[in-house]
């Protein structure tokens, strides 16, 4: 039996109900006034829910049953690589020698963990074609910012203080211009051509002596490989700029092509995506950054090194940009990524890309008769459709996404990239079977037919979820972020 009207945990609360008993205090009691200034001490007790352990278990178990994740269903969220995360990763991450160590331990006592991190760096160097890697950044956008700070340090060390502009394509991830801004750069947009690739003539127009870097995803966010990448690298390098690789779409080229061989100077990776660290719930992530030799002096300190005496962190880095994270990255995610890489091997990683690309092209060809296909060519790991023909019939891409919820599917990414009208971006990943793909495709075809025959069904969706249509404008402008007790009912 499912309770469709799930109470808030505060509404389950009963005064005086206790979930846990705490042990008797066995240390000296300290008054808060002796530790904190009065401004930081509550005048009244916090209004926390008073519930039993059973209440807590039932409440959060019921809520968890409403969630959708990779383990519960198909998750074709474009540009997010929502692949299945092998559970062997979790087993290894829970080894006592990994799970129970502390980052402040003496290096001599954690040599095994340091060896794993060093070996992971070596694997990532081989995969990307870079000269070295740091595991310190905590996530993708954090890696972007770190890479841009390295580029900034490089230019400033060479006296190029006028290189203040970073070029990004009009199909770029939103984090690219955001990271550039946070790193102190001005963002310049380069246009895509009619084939969905960077327009070389427009690139030549915007590149100049103020260019610090060009940020690219390859394949790009339209799922298309930038086939002119070598010429693009030459254009940027001849102008004195650096080429930055956003590793969001690395799943499309594993063991097939390497960013370093394409001419990229800096690369960030998303271990929580490509290399199966769990993601989608807000963290933690891991966004290692790889660089070519001329950027090594500026890597954040410390760097992990191997000597004849074992592994150690080198803090003697006078030109480093400093730390970008306490300690040395999100170790647990790095353990999971290392486990995945070692279990797959080079042939397995090559197969990852082959099946990811095959799945995406299969889905694209089956759906093309029912939705507009902006770029009718082979895609890589993901592809974009357009809901333009459905919009002409009064149904938006947003409606299509909400209708998919009725069938138990997480919707694809919608309205991104921004250069495709009514965009629907689908990434199936390599871990899904043909049967799963066909099930999703059949529902997308059904929705396309409903738009033509009974559009109200789609316009009013979802119909089967606990929460129906939200007032998205009010949710954005006047969000309710704190629980407030309802006013007493006057009798």
UniProtKB/Swiss-Prot annotation:
InterPro entries: GcvPB, GDC-P_C, GDC-P_N, GDC_P, PyrdxlP-dep_Trfase, PyrdxlP-dep_Trfase_major, PyrdxlP-dep_Trfase_small
Family: Belongs to the GcvP family. C-terminal subunit subfamily.
TM region positions: none
Annotated Gene3D superfamilies: 6.20.440.10, Aspartate Aminotransferase, domain 1, Type I PLP-dependent aspartate aminotransferase-like (Major domain)
One of the record's GO molecular function terms: glycine binding
Modified residues (N6-(pyridoxal phosphate)lysine): 273
Annotated protein name in UniProt: Probable glycine dehydrogenase (decarboxylating) subunit 2
Subunit description: The glycine cleavage system is composed of four proteins: P, T, L and H. In this organism, the P 'protein' is a heterodimer of two subunits.
Protein's UniProt keywords contain Repeat: no
């Amino acid at each position: 039996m499912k309770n469709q009207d799930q109470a808030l945990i505060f509404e389950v609360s009963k005064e005086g109900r206790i979930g846990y008993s705490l042990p008797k205090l066995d240390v000296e009691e300290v008054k808060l006034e002796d530790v904190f200034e009065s401004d930081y001490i509550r005048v009244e007790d916090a209004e926390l829910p008073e519930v039993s352990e059973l209440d807590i278990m039932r409440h959060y178990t019921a809520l968890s049953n409403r969630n959708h994740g990779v383990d519960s269903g198909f998750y074709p969220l474009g540009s997010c690589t929502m692949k299945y995360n092998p559970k062997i990763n979790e087993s290894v991450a829970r080894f006592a020698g990994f799970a129970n160590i502390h980052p402040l331990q003496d290096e001599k006592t954690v040599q095994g963990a340091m060896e794993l991190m060093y070996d992971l760096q070596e694997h990532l160097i081989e995969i990307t074609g870079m000269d070295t890697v740091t595991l310190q950044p905590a996530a993708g956008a954090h890696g972007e910012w770190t890479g841009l700070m390295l580029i900034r340090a490089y230019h400033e060390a060479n006296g190029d203080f006028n290189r203040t502009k970073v070029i990004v394509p009009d199909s770029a991830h939103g984090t690219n211009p955001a990271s550039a801004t946070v790193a102190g750069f001005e963002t310049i947009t380069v246009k895509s051509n009619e084939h969905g690739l960077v327009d070389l003539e427009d690139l030549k127009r915007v590149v100049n002596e103020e260019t610090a870097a060009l940020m690219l995803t390859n394949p790009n966010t339209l799922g298309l490989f930038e086939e002119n990448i070598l010429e693009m690298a030459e254009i940027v390098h001849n102008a004195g700029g650096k080429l930055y690789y956003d590793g969001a779409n690395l799943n499309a080229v594993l063991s097939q092509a390497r960013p370093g061989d394409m001419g990229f100077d800096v690369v960030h990776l998303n271990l929580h995506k490509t290399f199966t660290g769990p993601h989608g719930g807000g963290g933690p992530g891991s966004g290692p950054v790889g660089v070519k030799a001329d950027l090594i002096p500026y890597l954040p300190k410390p760097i992990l090194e191997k000597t004849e005496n074992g592994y150690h962190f080198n803090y003697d880095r006078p030109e480093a940009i400093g730390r970008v994270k306490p300690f040395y990255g999100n170790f647990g995610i790095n353990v999971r990524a290392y486990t995945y890489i070692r279990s797959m091997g080079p042939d397995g990683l090559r197969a990852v890309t082959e099946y990811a690309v095959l799945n995406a092209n299969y889905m694209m060809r089956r759906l093309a008769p029912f939705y507009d296909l902006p770029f009718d060519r082979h895609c890589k790991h993901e592809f974009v459709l357009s809901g333009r023909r459905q919009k002409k019939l009064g149904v938006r891409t947003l409606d299509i996404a909400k209708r998919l919820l009725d069938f138990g599917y997480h919707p694809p990414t919608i309205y991104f990239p921004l250069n495709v009208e009514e965009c629907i971006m689908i990434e199936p990943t390599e871990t899904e079977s043909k049967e799963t793909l066909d099930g999703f495709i059949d529902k997308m075809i059904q929705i396309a037919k409903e738009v033509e025959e009974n559009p109200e069904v789609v316009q009013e969706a979802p119909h089967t979820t606990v929460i129906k249509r939200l007032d998205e404008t009010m949710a954005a402008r006047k969000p309710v972020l704190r629980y407030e007790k309802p006013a007493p009912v006057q009798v």
